[in-house]
């Protein structure tokens, strides 16, 4: 704000930043966030928990395994405050582990002794370790949650091909996602140039960064440049990049304008990406999807229904 520099934030989800834009628009109007904020992400935790974990699978209890980081603590608060009461799932134990942990057998044993219906993992640092040990130990309880390492195609080799059964919330597009033609062309170009180095696939914020640059430069072209600032801000607010697949709106890179109210949460999200968190998701892209790695190394989107390319399953060693 001090330097009045046009800013496109491609990976921060903290809703407090968006609230600053809402509350002090003139001061922060040059800031745009093109990933859905925490409030929007939380709705997917709840919807997946209710529709799949509770209603489809019949699961009612969980043990949360959370890394000892600020990220882990923040996600646990959302899960504790929203997933449990709104999806009807009870947290019967909460295990916090050090990110330098190399032996997860005592942690998994503790979780299993509580006899939960499933384990909810929250991991962003060295997530490959609990993932591979979950398979190696053949932990007899299903596990889902947030596993950042599983966002990328490198995950399978990083786990020594022991990532089967892992499911996680993921930004979009994701591994296992049905790509539209334009996005597939970007993936093909990326893999041709960088496919032999890490990451081998443009995961995490790669896609929203790519399309966000189009937003920023298209706005600048119409405004006559990035300065004067007000002209660029106005054109960024008018940006609306819609991408279709098979006649359906598939991805959307636009921004909430000042005064617009998101209907489900009844809040303003000025300059946040224009996500859609109300079924049937026909006005924008969802805040996230849920992906799953299968035991043969393939992946699929398992939720929400519109983007589903496979079924949510439990590992073969678990008898339901």
Cite the ranges covered by each PLM segment.
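Hydrophobic alpha-helical
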Residues: 1-2, 79, 109, 116-137, ...
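Extracellular/periplasmic periplasmic-binding protein-like sensory domains
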Residues: 14, 35-39, 134-211, 221-222, ...
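Residue-level signal for nonpolar/aromatic packing positions in well-ordered secondary structure
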Residues: 49, 62, 79, 119, ...
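Structural motif
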Residues: 41-46, 97-111
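Extracytoplasmic ligand/sensor domains, especially the bilobed periplasmic-binding protein
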Residues: 1-93, 142-168, 175
């Amino acid at each position: 704000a001090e330097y009045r520099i046009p800013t496109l934030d491609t990976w921060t989800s903290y809703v407090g930043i968006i609230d600053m834009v809402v509350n002090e628009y003139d001061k922060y109007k040059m800031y745009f966030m093109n990933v859905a904020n925490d409030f929007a992400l939380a709705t997917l935790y709840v919807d997946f928990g209710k529709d799949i974990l509770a209603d489809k699978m019949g699961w009612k209890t969980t043990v949360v395994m959370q890394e000892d980081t600020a990220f882990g603590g923040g996600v646990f608060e959302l899960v504790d405050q929203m997933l449990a009461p709104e999806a009807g799932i009870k947290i019967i134990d909460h295990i916090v582990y050090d990110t330098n942990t190399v032996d997860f057998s005592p942690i998994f044993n503790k979780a299993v002794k509580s006899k939960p219906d499933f384990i909810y993992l929250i991991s962003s640092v060295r997530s490959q370790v609990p993932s591979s040990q979950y398979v190696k130990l053949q932990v007899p309880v299903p596990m889902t949650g947030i596993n950042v390492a599983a966002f990328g195609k490198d995950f399978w080799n990083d786990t020594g091909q022991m990532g089967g059964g892992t499911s996680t919330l993921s930004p979009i597009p994701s591994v296992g996602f049905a790509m539209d033609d334009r996005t597939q062309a970007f993936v093909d170009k990326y893999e041709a140039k960088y496919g032999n180095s890490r990451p081998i696939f443009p995961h995490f914020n790669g896609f929203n960064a790519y399309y966000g640059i189009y937003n920023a430069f298209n706005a600048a072209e119409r405004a006559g440049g990035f300065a004067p600032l007000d002209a660029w801000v106005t054109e960024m607010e008018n940006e609306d990049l819609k991408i279709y697949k098979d006649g359906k709106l598939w991805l959307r890179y636009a921004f909430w304008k000042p005064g617009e109210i998101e209907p489900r949460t009844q809040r303003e999200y000025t300059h946040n990406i224009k996500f859609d968190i109300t079924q049937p998701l026909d006005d924008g892209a969802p805040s996230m999807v849920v992906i799953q790695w299968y035991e043969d190394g393939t992946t699929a989107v398992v939720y929400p229904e519109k983007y589903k390319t496979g079924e949510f399953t439990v590992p073969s060693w678990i008898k339901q």
